[in-house]
Swiss-Prot record:
Residues 490-651 form the Helicase C-terminal domain. It comes from Pyricularia oryzae (strain 70-15 / ATCC MYA-4617 / FGSC 8958). Its EC number is 3.6.4.12. GO terms for molecular function: 3'-5' DNA helicase activity; ATP binding; ATP hydrolysis activity; four-way junction DNA binding; four-way junction helicase activity. InterPro entries: FANCM/Mph1-like_ID (IPR039686), FANCM_DEXDc (IPR044749), Helicase/UvrB_N (IPR006935), Helicase_ATP-bd (IPR014001), Helicase_C-like (IPR001650), P-loop_NTPase (IPR027417). A motif (DEAH box) lies at residues 263-266. It holds the Pfam family Helicase_C. GO terms for cellular component: nucleus. This is ATP-dependent DNA helicase MPH1. It is found in: Nucleus. ATP-dependent DNA helicase involved in DNA damage repair by homologous recombination and in genome maintenance. Capable of unwinding D-loops. Plays a role in limiting crossover recombinants during mitotic DNA double-strand break (DSB) repair. Component of a FANCM-MHF complex which promotes gene conversion at blocked replication forks, probably by reversal of the stalled fork. Residues 687-699 have a biased composition (Basic residues). ATP binds at residues 160-167.
């Protein structure tokens, strides 16, 4: 390479050098004298050129040059006879160069490079004095030593044939950067987890890096575990996709990465994860080393250049099998090419399938879209290319119907081209399975499917072909392809020659999974001599599931241990897998890619001589293999020459200071004890971060970046004085700080409402009328409600919580913690009510024979006279109210009683309607609900008005009450204001209805037995209810005598009719049998009247 630069001076004319040394003259006269002198001294060749010196430099740009003596043309000059032009017609050498980032292909010297920015990594000055080369594996190999030395100081692309120790080179470079830096991190990335797992053993057991400082991360590892590993470990083995995710989420710090080892670097093209990782790290740091490992850099010059640009490679170390320094370490590989002819069965199937495809193939041939006579020669790529060319050309102006028809035919033929490839290169069974799936899909759609698909499967030749294939595949021992027959014979002979107990192993490579499954099935027929296992990728197919990474690792381990001796693998086994002592490689199908072919061949000949057998079909497959071999040899020469590639010296930093020159230290590296005790993979354990969660996403910023806002003036360097003065804004008012002192208590006159305001409040807001009949009361808000919310600070808008509020909240919260867990949220400490008062059984009704009813004080039940005691109903059953009906009209009575909480609150009434009997001949029934409150609130009762029967009230009056004698237990129902109204209100009241004359009074002492009237009126205990006008009547015939009501007279006996159902609301009863009481006969006399009365418990919980 240096000879090209040294010979540059020979191409420069001596006249040009002499002209550069002469000083420039001024003036026309001096110029003419100089020209005459030059002409007289010039040679015939140069005199003509000097005469044209006055013309412009571009006067003869497009004129032919003067013919000179033709020099002897060399191979280099002959290559310059062709000129490359641009799209505008200019010569490529004269066209302006694009603004690219690649430097010119020139020799780079250290002195010509700009001064390098010191690295931001913390280095160990003592360790930088030496670099270690391990001698654990035996003698030193020169090519490995040279590659490691260059890889320490340059971004290097290492291209070595398989089995020559690329992993050892990577482990040595990792070891030295591990020593040189204090807390920097090294990452080894591989395309798959099995490949990454293999590198762990080499780095830990060869380089001696502590196991506690290394880890293996994949996509299966939880993010919280990966984050913890990035914080404490220094060496990472992972897939590029996982590394990209950790970088983007902020788990990994790109500034800490000092070394990135890329395995199978030929994948670093396009949008692969390798490219994204390098770009991401380079955004934040340029001080990191890249070591790229591969066996085949690429198949084209452009592909290799993409790898160099994407990885920032500045140096290439490439070796071939013919290189002198590796010739002693390459084992011989015997390549055996077997060319086979198609079988008679294949030819018959091809003939029938060609007849079936002929109608569809002729339609695209007539349009001159796809030229070809034989339908069996179609390929997927050829059809796709022809379709694109037609759409860009004649297809743009074609009829829409024609275009849609041709596109449908193209789609069908492209799907069938894969089946043709399976038939030609893999066998009849994969071909038959593919067409069975095609036919089933078409038949399932029925008439909704493509008509061209139905036309194809309806062809007689297609049906005959499928019948023949199905019949042949049912025959035992039918191979279906000559490759299968030759494969079985070759393996049987190979294992028989190896002898029993041999440890030899074989790998069979196939491109498609269907073909690999068929090969495995056929080989396992010859057990126990041949024991085959399938090795495929993780993706699922239509017929079978993929292999997880764990299953892949287990399969490789079993193959190494000799549990089975044949491994049938797809492309997943081509790259990088160190499967072990493989002595025979069989390529079931040849690939046109030289990368894939070399990767396959590299699986053998690693530690001893190997053999490679290629099974090729005569024709196209044989030609593809020849092209792959030629392309590989050509690319190896170009890479070794290096003149066609531009290397990125600008992206390769030395990291180690230039004044530091480490010396090599060849020694035996000590392996830590922890590396030998535990042989498992260093994967993070789930128990180490139990209960932790992944942190939020972090955003890494480059060094020196300003995260704040910069004005345009500051970016242009304009001082603040030159900028326009900003208008003065009014200063913001200082926010009042919170004080610990409580504000003084205001006087009550300024806070409480006046008498007038209180009356207005009661009138407008507290007492809301309901149809101008009843009064509904709105209670004031309670400060003790919602105790759970008083233990937490509620959201605020304008006013923040004060210090005393916070102290109170903490106090309430601390008090709640002092309660038990079960009672913390129940009343009175919470809002939950667990008293279960609804589950209390309803008290039994008592039979009233007209005698006195004794009211039991609070906490006791109301007692009955011995003659009227009734047995309690069974618990758990609801009691329904007895209903009777009058002969003429329905009788309704609603009685509700409420007690208010304070003495100042006025009483309001709510109606509860029940049906009651109105006939004087029937027994009297009514229901009274009594509620007791904590304060001395007044109780209000309502009775019916005009058409309500007086009999419903008679049930509440005993003989003693009728004579003015109230029981002593009734004294609690009177107030001090009712002392003047303890007797004789019946004579004074004016009756406007049947019941308005009857009043039930409260008594604080013994009631008077006389019926005398009082001079003053008091507030009644029962308030008459206002009934709608539709139920009013002037008929008072049903009005019974007062004597009958109090039991002094006997009413006339009448026959009762069954009561009709009413829409009134009744209190339910626990005894369903009480409904039959409506049919009881009426018995004269108060002593024989039996009416069920409810015994009310006079307590707060009732």
């Amino acid at each position: 390479m240096g000879s090209d630069y040294d010979s540059f001076d020979d191409d420069v004319a001596d006249e040009v050098l002499m002209a550069l040394d002469k000083p420039a003259t001024s003036g026309l006269h001096s110029r003419e004298q100089e020209q005459q002198r030059d002409i007289s001294n010039a040679t015939p060749h140069t005199s003509t050129d000097l005469e044209l010196e006055d013309f412009g430099s571009d006067a003869f740009d497009y004129s032919p040059e003067r013919e000179r003596a033709k020099p002897i043309q060399t191979a280099r000059n002959q290559a310059r006879t062709f000129q490359q032009t641009t799209l505008l017609g200019r010569i490529a050498s004269q066209a302006p160069e694009p603004l690219g980032t690649q430097p010119r292909n020139s020799r780079v010297f250290r002195a010509d490079l700009p001064p390098e920015v010191p690295t931001h990594h913390a280095l160990d000055p003592e360790a930088l004095k030496t670099w270690v080369y391990p001698t654990n594996l035996g003698p030193i190999r020169d090519y490995q030593f040279s590659i490691v030395k260059n890889g320490l100081f340059n971004n290097t692309l290492v291209a070595l044939p398989t089995g020559l120790g690329k992993t050892f080179i990577a482990a040595t470079v990792i070891l030295n950067f591990f020593r040189w830096t204090r807390n920097a991190q090294m990452v080894f990335v591989a395309p798959t987890k099995p490949l990454a797992s293999q590198q762990v053993e080499a780095c830990l057991n060869i380089a001696g890096i502590p196991r506690s400082q290394s880890t293996l991360l994949t996509g299966e590892t939880k993010p919280v575990l990966r984050e913890a590993e990035w914080e404490g470990k220094r060496l990472f083995f992972m897939t590029p996709q996982t590394l990209m995710n950790d970088l983007s989420k902020g788990y990994a710090d790109p500034k800490r990465i000092v070394l990135l080892v890329v395995d199978e670097a030929h994948r670093a093209t396009g949008d692969y994860a390798y490219v994204k990782v390098i770009e991401f790290i380079r955004r934040f740091s340029k001080s990191f080393r890249v070591l790229a490992l591969t066996a085949t850099p690429g198949s084209t010059v452009e592909g290799v250049q993409d790898v160099i640009d994407n990885l920032g490679v500045s140096h290439v170390e490439i070796r071939t099998e013919e290189s002198i320094d590796i010739r002693n370490y390459v084992h011989s590989r015997e390549i055996d090419r077997v060319v086979l002819e198609p079988s008679d069965e294949m030819l018959r199937i091809s003939e029938l399938f060609s007849q079936a495809l002929k109608p569809l193939h002729s339609k695209i041939s007539q349009q001159k879209i796809y030229i070809g006579r034989d339908p069996m020669s179609i390929t997927t790529f050829g059809l796709l290319k022809a379709r694109q060319d037609w759409m860009k050309g004649p297809g743009r102006f074609a009829n829409q119907g024609l275009k849609m028809m041709l596109m449908a035919i193209f789609t069908i033929l492209q799907s069938l081209a894969h089946a043709i490839k399976l038939l030609n290169y893999h066998g009849i069974r994969p071909f038959y399975d593919n067409l069975v799936a095609f036919r089933s899909e078409t038949e399932d759609k029925g008439q909704k499917g493509s008509k061209y698909k139905r036309q194809l499967i309806g062809e007689q030749s297609f049906q005959e072909m499928m019948d023949l294939a199905s019949k042949w595949l049912k025959i035992d021992g039918f191979a279906g392809h000559p490759k299968l027959t030759h494969l079985c014979d070759n393996l049987l002979n190979y294992f028989m020659d190896a002898g029993e107990g041999s440890s030899t192993r074989v790998i069979v490579f196939s491109e498609y999974r269907d073909s690999a499954e068929e090969i495995t099935r056929v080989l396992n027929v010859h057990k126990p001599m041949i024991s085959a296992s399938l090795f495929v990728g993780q993706a699922d197919s239509k017929k079978s599931e993929g292999m997880k990474q764990k299953q892949q690792i287990e399969t490789i381990a079993k193959f190494r241990d000799g549990i089975f001796n044949v491994l049938v693998a797809t492309s997943i086994g081509e790259e990088g897998l160190d499967i072990g002592q493989v002595d025979l490689i069989i390529c079931y199908d040849a690939s046109s890619s030289p990368i894939r072919m070399l990767q396959r061949m590299g699986r053998t000949g690693r530690k001893r001589a190997g053999k490679i057998t290629l099974l090729l079909m005569k024709g196209k497959e044989e030609d593809n293999y020849a092209k792959a071999q030629d392309n590989y040899e050509k690319m190896q020469k170009l890479i070794c020459e290096g003149s066609r590639f531009n290397f990125r010296h600008d992206l390769s930093s030395r990291i180690v200071p230039r004044d530091v020159k480490p010396e090599v230290d060849k020694r035996m590296v000590e392996i830590p004890i922890e590396n030998t005790q535990d042989t498992s993979l260093p994967e993070p354990k789930a128990r180490s971060t139990r209960g932790k969660k992944a942190s939020k996403k972090k955003f890494n910023m480059p060094d020196g970046v300003e995260t704040g806002f910069n004005s345009v003036a500051s970016m242009l360097g304009i001082s603040a004085s030159k900028t326009k003065a900003k208008p003065n804004k009014s200063p913001k008012k200082a926010e009042s700080k919170e004080t610990d002192e409580i504000s003084p208590v205001p006087p009550l006159e300024g806070v409480l409402l006046s008498v007038k305001e209180l009356a207005e409040l009661n009138k407008k807001y507290r007492d809301l009328p309901f149809f101008h009949q009843d009064t509904e009361e709105i209670c004031m808000p309670s400060l003790t409600a919602r105790p759970d919310l008083q233990r937490v600070l509620r959201p605020t808008v304008h006013v923040k919580h004060g210090s005393y509020t916070k102290r109170c909240v903490r106090l309430f919260k601390k008090l709640s913690h002092s309660q038990g867990i079960e009672t913390r949220h129940t009343k009175p400490h919470g809002d939950t009510d667990k008293s279960r008062y609804l589950d209390i059984s309803v008290p039994p009704f008592a039979e009233d024979s007209g005698e006195d009813v004794v009211v039991v004080p609070s906490g006791r039940k109301r007692s009955l006279s011995p003659s009227s005691a009734a047995s309690p109903p069974p618990p758990g059953r609801k009691r329904k109210a007895n209903t009777t009906a009058a002969p003429r009209s329905k009788r309704q009575s609603v009685v509700d009683e409420y007690a208010s909480e304070s003495e100042d609150d006025t009483a309001a009434a709510r109606q509860r309607k029940t049906n009651a009997a109105a006939s004087p001949e029937s027994k009297r029934q009514s229901v009274l609900d009594e509620y007791a409150s904590e304060s001395d609130a007044e109780a209000v009762t309502q009775a019916s008005e005009d058409e309500e029967s007086v009999g419903s009230l008679a049930d509440f009056i005993s003989d003693g009450e009728a004579n003015g004698n109230f029981p002593k237990d009734m004294t609690g129902f009177t107030s001090d204001e009712d002392d003047d109204y303890r007797s004789g209100s019946l004579a004074k009241s004016s009756l406007s209805g049947p019941l308005s004359g009857r009043q039930v009074h409260r008594s604080s002492g013994a009631a008077s037995k006389s019926g005398s009237t009082a001079s003053t009126a008091a507030k009644p205990f029962f308030v008459p209810a206002s009934l709608p006008g539709t139920q009013q009547t002037d008929d008072d015939e049903d009005m019974p005598d007062i004597g009958i009501l109090v039991g002094k007279k006997q009413p006339e006996t009448r026959v009762r009719k069954p009561a009709k159902k009413s829409n009134a609301v009744f209190l339910s009863s626990d005894d369903d049998d009480d409904d039959n009481d409506d049919e009881d006969d009426v018995q004269p006399g108060p002593a024989k009247r039996t009416v069920r009365r409810r015994v009310i418990e006079d307590s707060e919980s009732g």
